[in-house]
């Protein structure tokens, strides 16, 4: 079982990854992870402004030749749209292009939890595509988002 704790910006998010099955071969293996996204944006940890919410959590399972976003680099149009308006459409188009190039194999989509709730999904990855990246907008904010960039599930 792998557990990852993230503390980002003004809220604390808990992402728990549990490897539930693995099939291994000589040079290739697959894994299924159960991913739970839990919002911890509440008093007394943080003041909760009116209308606070997360947007749909959108990402991908990919290889080391790409990333969804990277700290210190200019945001793509898709990342910018999620951060500024919560619009996931441009990021879906970007991920489609990355999949078409063979650098990603699937989407990661988690319905937005309430500020203090959680949602869970299963993700499938393999030794050729071991990275997960995703993001969600923190609202109401000018352009804040949180997420994971190129986390290696096989490390």
Locate each region found by the language model.
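Positively charged n-region of N-terminal signal peptides that target proteins for export
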Residues: 1-4, 18
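Sparse, context-dependent recognition of short Cys/His-centered cofactor- or disulfide-binding micro-motifs
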Residues: 2, 22, 117-119
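Bacterial Sec-dependent N-terminal signal peptides
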Residues: 15-31
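Structured domain cores in non-transmembrane regions
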Residues: 26-32, 41-145
């Amino acid at each position: 079982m792998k557990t990852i704790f993230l503390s980002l910006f003004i809220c604390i998010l808990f992402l728990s990854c549990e490897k539930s099955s693995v099939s291994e071969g000589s040079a290739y293996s697959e894994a299924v992870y159960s991913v739970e996204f839990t919002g911890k944006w509440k008093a007394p940890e943080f003041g909760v402004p009116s209308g606070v919410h997360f947007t749909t959590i959108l990402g991908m399972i990919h290889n080391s030749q790409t990333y969804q976003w990277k700290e210190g680099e200019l945001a793509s149009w898709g990342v910018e749209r999620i951060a500024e308006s919560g619009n996931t459409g441009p990021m879906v188009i970007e991920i489609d292009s990355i999949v078409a190039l063979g650098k990603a194999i699937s989407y990661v989509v988690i319905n937005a939890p309430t500020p203090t709730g959680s949602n869970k999904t299963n993700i499938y990855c393999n030794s050729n595509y071991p990275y997960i990246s995703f993001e969600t907008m923190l609202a109401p904010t000018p352009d804040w988002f949180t997420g994971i960039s190129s986390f290696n599930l096989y490390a």
